[in-house]
């Protein structure tokens, strides 16, 4: 972590450093620092790679969930989907969020949208949960709860 912090200080305009540092703060459960750094990442002029921006938005949503700001989390999930609509991860995390709210039409919409994406992007941003059983499981739960067994 000290090296990431140093890199972010030495290159404050480098979006990758800001993204990585924010992500690491999130992994360590330092929600406030994570949020601050991820917001900084999104505000940087050179922060233009949609996949990385969408990941920062998903991480911001996770920070919001961990600090009890569910509605704000949903806004970040929506923004992540809008930023990178060709990536499954935003849809799957949004579907998971809706499952926690028992919003079964929302779960179905987001999980089916994720499953409609069949080409896995070849970047490090991919997360296994989006390409394994999770979107299928969420979709099945939604169908069951909606009486479409």
For the regions a language model picked out, list residue spans one by one.
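Catalytic-site signature of metal-activated, phosphate-bearing donor transferases
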Residues: 1-36
């Amino acid at each position: 972590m000290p090296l990431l912090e140093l890199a972010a200080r030495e290159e404050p305009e480098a979006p990758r450093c800001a993204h990585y540092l924010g992500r690491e703060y999130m992994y360590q459960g330092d929600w406030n620092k994570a949020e601050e750094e991820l917001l900084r990442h999104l505000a940087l002029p050179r922060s233009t790679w949609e996949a990385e921006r969408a990941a920062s938005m998903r991480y911001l949503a996770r920070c919001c969930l961990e600090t009890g700001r569910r509605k704000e989390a949903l806004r970040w999930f929506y923004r992540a989907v809008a930023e990178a609509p060709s990536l499954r991860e935003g849809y799957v995390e949004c579907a998971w969020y809706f499952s926690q709210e028992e919003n079964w039409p929302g779960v179905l919409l987001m999980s089916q949208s994720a499953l409609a994406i069949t080409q896995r992007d070849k970047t490090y941003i991919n997360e296994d949960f989006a390409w394994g059983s999770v979107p299928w499981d969420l979709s099945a739960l939604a169908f069951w709860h909606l009486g479409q067994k």
